[in-house]
């Protein structure tokens, strides 16, 4: 599903129904409030790409929660992002004991927690880094977000965190993981290889049966949706498998995964709102042609949009294509790739 013109003609009229209509009576925030948890001394571009992609797609507000070493840089990229320098890493605090770490984690959770309920979806991982104190704080944020029933999109070092601590995310149906090929292999090794005595410690991932293996992995994760990125993107929640093979761009410039994460977060927030509306038009069509699961709908829509935007950017810029060029096309492709946006 999702590649040839016949399939797209079937899918797009369904996907477009979850996109909120722009109308004079709507107020700021109704088209989506997205948060990105990520950004440290080394990595400032990734959280910016994810957050600005959400805005360019049509979300009303985008927040970034990062370390103090990343905040000023991210703020300088765009005045449209709301940046919170509340995360901490070992470099900031030096050598501290377990009691101090626990207190620091509580402080971070209090700062982030007072904002959480405002968000329609949270992206976790772009530019996060792997500092142990920082990851401990983010693990606590994930638990709090789950308690508040907020959709989560995990990418980059967010995937590193939940691959090593899968109990953080197993059984949470509003979570989307977006692994590339290598990240997917590590997930399979952790979830299947280490937990099932009937399979090898490092089970082989077969390209021939990737959809089936992905569905099995999602099922073992008890309803988590997985968007496995590759030549074809495969998406599964353990119940069914969708695919997105619309040709995008041969350029593999860094940051495209961050664009996908931000875009998917917006679509998930729209889909969740759509399915919660008992009077939403065309709900049966969306359920039959795509899925009744907002994370599946959001992941497929995000994948298709990013592929089309990347294709347009490459057609214009060729080998010079960068992630910034792809972001420029998001809003335009959202308007023209589908049908009803106003």
From Swiss-Prot:
PROSITE patterns: YJEF_C_3 (PS51383). Keywords: ATP-binding, Lyase, NAD, NADP, Nucleotide-binding, Phosphoprotein. Pfam families: Carb_kinase (PF01256). InterPro entries: CARKD, Ribokinase-like. It is an enzyme of class 4 (lyase). Its EC number is 4.2.1.93. GO terms for biological process: metabolite repair; nicotinamide nucleotide metabolic process. Its cofactor is Mg(2+). (6S)-NADPHX binds at residues 127, 180-186, 258. ATP binds at residues 229-233, 248-257. It comes from the Eukaryota. GO terms for molecular function: ATP binding; ATP-dependent NAD(P)H-hydrate dehydratase activity. Belongs to the NnrD/CARKD family. NCBIfam families: yjeF_cterm. This is ATP-dependent (S)-NAD(P)H-hydrate dehydratase. It comes from Physcomitrium patens (Spreading-leaved earth moss).
């Amino acid at each position: 599903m999702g590649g040839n013109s016949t399939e797209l003609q079937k899918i797009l009229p369904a996907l477009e129904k979850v996109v909120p209509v722009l109308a004079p009576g709507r107020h700021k925030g109704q088209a989506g409030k997205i948060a990105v948890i990520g950004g440290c001394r080394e990595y400032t571009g990734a959280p910016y790409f994810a957050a600005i992609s959400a805005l360019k797609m049509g979300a009303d507000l985008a927040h970034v929660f990062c370390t103090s070493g990343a905040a000023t840089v991210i703020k300088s990229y765009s005045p449209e992002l709301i940046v919170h320098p509340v995360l901490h890493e070992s470099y900031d605090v030096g050598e501290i004991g377990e009691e101090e770490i626990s207190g620091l984690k509580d402080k971070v959770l209090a700062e982030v927690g007072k904002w959480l309920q405002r968000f329609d979806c949270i992206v976790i991982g772009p530019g996060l880094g792997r500092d142990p104190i920082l990851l401990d704080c983010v693990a606590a944020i994930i638990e709090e977000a789950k308690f508040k029933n907020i959709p989560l999109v995990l990418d980059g070092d967010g995937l590193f965190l939940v691959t090593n601590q899968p109990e953080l995310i197993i059984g949470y149906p509003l979570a989307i993981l977006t692994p590339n090929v290598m990240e997917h292999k590590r997930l399979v090794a952790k979830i299947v290889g280490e937990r099932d005595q009937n399979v090898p410690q490092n089970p082989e991932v077969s390209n021939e049966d990737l959809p089936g293996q992905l569905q099995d992995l999602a099922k073992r994760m008890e309803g988590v949706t997985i968007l496995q990125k590759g030549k074809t993107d495969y998406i599964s929640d353990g119940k069914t498998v969708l695919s997105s093979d619309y040709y995008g761009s041969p350029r593999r410039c860094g940051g495209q995964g961050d664009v996908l994460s931000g875009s998917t977060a917006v679509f998930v927030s729209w889909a969740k709102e759509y399915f919660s509306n008992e009077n939403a038009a065309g709900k049966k069509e969306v359920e039959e042609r795509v899925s009744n699961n907002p994370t599946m709908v959001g992941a497929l829509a995000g994948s298709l949009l990013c592929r089309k935007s990347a294709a347009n950017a490459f057609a214009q810029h060729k080998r010079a294509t960068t992630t910034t060029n792809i972001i420029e096309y998001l809003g335009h492709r959202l308007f023209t790739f589908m049908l009803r946006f106003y």
